[in-house]
Amino acid sequence: SCPDGIATLILREVPFRGEGYILVRGVFGTLEGLLAECAGFCRAAGAERLFAAGEADFSGYPAAIRIRERSAPRESLLPAPEAVRLVPVTEETAADWAREYNARFRAVPAAESCSPAEERALAAGGEALWIWDGAERIGLGRVRGGELLAVAALQPGAGERCVRALAAQCTGPEVRLTCAEENRRAMRLYDRLGFSRGAEERVWFSI
């Protein structure tokens, strides 16, 4: 907090890709003053690119990342391809999963990296999965209830098979996820699979 307001600084992506995020909770003075104070702290921590969102009027800043809610009836994504199977991450494969995940999501707007602490918890959580098609490892994913937290193809053209396989792991009548509109390849895949375009969950503005 500072005289101009309150914000949460998200610095976990600074070591991974040099990005800092400022989530504004309230403005008491000016938004410019609050962002300047926060930006100085973020840059001192090593952030090279800064984004802000939250409870404020950001009309003077360019929208950089639009996070969109998407959903589809689970039954419409089934059955999963017959030869495709899901294999839970183990303690022996957790480091490999985290490495592949971080490599695939490094260029995805506003995606969270898998930290060393999260890597150590992957096997125990049961959410992280490898996706195999026969003898070939084609992707990875993370599922929690009816939500796809992550999906990434490791082979060209495997995206649809990965989504369908993970949908089979979901519970409930609907498969939900969020996707940055700027991640155009993923957005096109979800369009093709019949995912609806819901509300904007959050818009990050470049500062």
Regions found by a protein language model. Give the residues of each.
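Conserved glycine-rich acetyl-CoA-binding loop
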Residues: 26-36, 44, 150-164, 181-188
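Short amphipathic alpha-helix that is part of the acyltransferase structural core
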Residues: 80-112
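A structural microfeature
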Residues: 7, 62-65, 137-139, 199
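Conserved hydrophobic beta-strand within the GNAT/NAT acetyltransferase core sheet
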Residues: 50-52, 148, 175-179
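Acyl-donor-binding surface of acyltransferase catalytic domains
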Residues: 24-83, 167-169, 201-207
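Active-site rim helix/loop that mediates acceptor-substrate recognition in acyltransferases
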Residues: 1-3, 107-130, 134
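Conserved donor-binding loop and adjoining core beta-sheet/short helix segment
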Residues: 1-37, 133-155
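Hydrophilic extracytoplasmic domains
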Residues: 165-169, 176-207
